[in-house]
C-alpha cells in the first residue's frame, strides 16, 4: 500500500489493524452491543503471587491501599494448584497450612471487586506433594531413564506431567471450583506447558497412538522424531487449553483461560482474546528491547487484542533470588519498553510480605504517570511502515551446518540495527504474508528467513508487485518449509541473483570496499563516504548476478592475519558485489549475501549498523513517518488512537545497555519530525510523561519539536481532528 493511502486509512479507521485478517471467532454473541468486553478495560495490572505462609502473616489492606494509590485496575492473584489459598473441597488439593478457617483469596477478590478491577486468578500445575504422588504415581513426570522426576528446587515435591491426567483431570476440577466460587475474568496457569519430554506411561501411549513412534530419546531440534514430538506436544497443549477454556466458559461465558507460553504464536493469536506475556526481566547479554520483542511477535496474529506484560521487581537470572529488588533504573527501562510497544504493565510480587520496599516508588511513579495519560495509551493501530519478518518454521527446521549455528542472531542483529537507526517497525509472522496482513507495510525485512514454502514466496512476489519493497539477507528462501535445501533461491527472480552452490566462511580478515560510482556515492553509503573499506561479514553465500546492478559495496577477499609481515591484501579490489540493489516500479529490492545482521550482533560494528540502516531507508523509498535525530540509542514506536497519534521515545543510551541491570539513567536530547496523517489537523502537542506542552513548528505536513533530557521514556502526543 502507498504511504498516502496507509496514513489516510489509519486516520479514518484507527482500529483497522485489530480487525484486518483476524477472525472474530471468540466473542461473538457473548457481549451485547452496549457492553464492552472486559479484555480492553484494564490498563495497569498487579500480581500478588502468594507463598504458603502468607495467610495470617501479611497485611492484605496494605496491598489494597497501594493498588488504590497507583490506580491498579487489574489484578492477578494466586488461587490454587500446588497450594490452595481458599477453602477448597477437592481431595488432595493442598490448602495453605496457615489458612485455618479463613478465605484469604476471597477477601482480596471481594475488595478488588469494590474497586472495579478485572480479576485473573492464578494456578500452578507443575508440581505435586508426596500424598498426591502416593495416590496417583502415574500423574508424575518421568525422566528418560525411567525415574519419577523430583522437583529441582525442592526435593520433597514431584514434577507433574503436563500432558497427562494431572492437568486434564485434576487441574480441570480445580479450575471449575475456582470459577464457581469466585467468578474471575480468567485463569492463568503458571508452568502449565511442561518441562521437556516426559516418559510417563500416558505420554508413551498417547504419542505412540498419535505417531506410531516411541518417544524421542533426545531433544535435538532437527531430529525427525523430536520434531514429531514437538507437533504432538503442541496439539496436546492445545487440547488442554481448549478444555480448560471450555469448562471456564460454561461457568462464566465471558471468562477465558490465558495460555501463556503456548508454543505457537499463530494459534495463540487466533484463539486468544487476551494474553499475558511472561518475560519478566532480562539476564545475560541482551538489551532492554527484548521486552518489546515478545509483544511485536504476537501482534501479527493477536492484532490489537490486549497484551499484558508481566515484569518482575527482582532479578530473573539462573540463580533465583525471588525476594530481590532490581535497580530503579532497570525496572523503569524494562517497563518503558513494554508500554512503548503496546503492552499493559503488570508488576509481580512474590509473597505478601515486603523485605525491601525500594521498588515501590518507581512502580508508583510510572503507574501514576501512565494513568494520567491513559487515553493516549489506548492504541488502535501501529503506524510503522517497516515490517521485520520472523519465522518459527525457520527456527524449528533450519540448521545443522557450521554457518547455520546461532541463526537466531540474524533477527537480533537486524532488530538492534533498526533500534540504532531510530526506525519504527513492527514484526511480521511468516505464516501471515497475505495482502491483508501486509497492507500496512511499505518494506519487509527478511533476516535470513531461510525456510519458506512456495506459497509464502508467491505471497512475497505479490507484495512486491503491489509496490512493496524487500531487504533480505544470507540464505533467505534457500530452503523449503520443511528445511529441505533448494537448488536455488525460491526468490531469485526478486533478488536478481542465483545461488552459486556454496557458503564461504568464516571470512577471516576480509573486507568490504565502499566506493563511489560516476562521481557520487550511493545513498547506502551515507556517513561512510570517507571509509574506503570496512570489515566484511563472517559468512557469505556465493551468488551469481542474473542482471545488472550498481556496485557500491564489493569484496576484498580474505588474506592472512599472521605473521604480521604477511598482512596485506592479495587482491586490492574485485567486482564481486556484497550488496545487490535493484528497483522495479515502486518497489526496491536489496539482497545482502553476507550474514551482516548476525555479524553485526556478534561484532557490533558501527559500520555494519550504518550499512543496514542506509539499506533499509533506501529500500523504504518514502519519507519516514517519524524522523528522530539524537546522539543516543532511542527506540521509536508510533501509534494511532481514536483522536490522536503518539510517538514513544525510549532512551536506551546506557553503559549497561547490552547487559543489565542499569545503574542509573543517562538523559538524552531528541529532535523529532512527525508526518501528520492526511486530512487531519493538529490541535495540540503534548509531552505526556512530563505533563507539558512543548514549543513546536508545523511546516507543510510535518510537526517538528525538540524533546530535551529524556531519562527513560517520553511520549509525544498529537491531538488530531
Predicted segments with their positions:
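Glycine-rich, aromatic-flanked loop segments that form ligand/cofactor-binding clefts
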Residues: 45, 74-77, 107-150
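Active-site-adjacent "subsite" loops/lids of carbohydrate-active enzymes
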Residues: 125-182, 217-230
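C-terminal segment of N-terminal export signals and the immediately downstream linker at the start
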Residues: 21-44
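Aromatic- and glycine-enriched glycan-recognition loops and surfaces
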Residues: 52-70, 93-115, 239, 409, ...
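Active-site neighborhood of glycoside hydrolase catalytic domains
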Residues: 166-261, 265-268
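Carbohydrate-binding surfaces of carbohydrate-active enzymes
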Residues: 226-721
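Aromatic-lined carbohydrate-binding/catalytic grooves of carbohydrate-active enzymes
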Residues: 70-102, 130-138, 203, 265-274
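N-terminal export signals
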Residues: 5-28
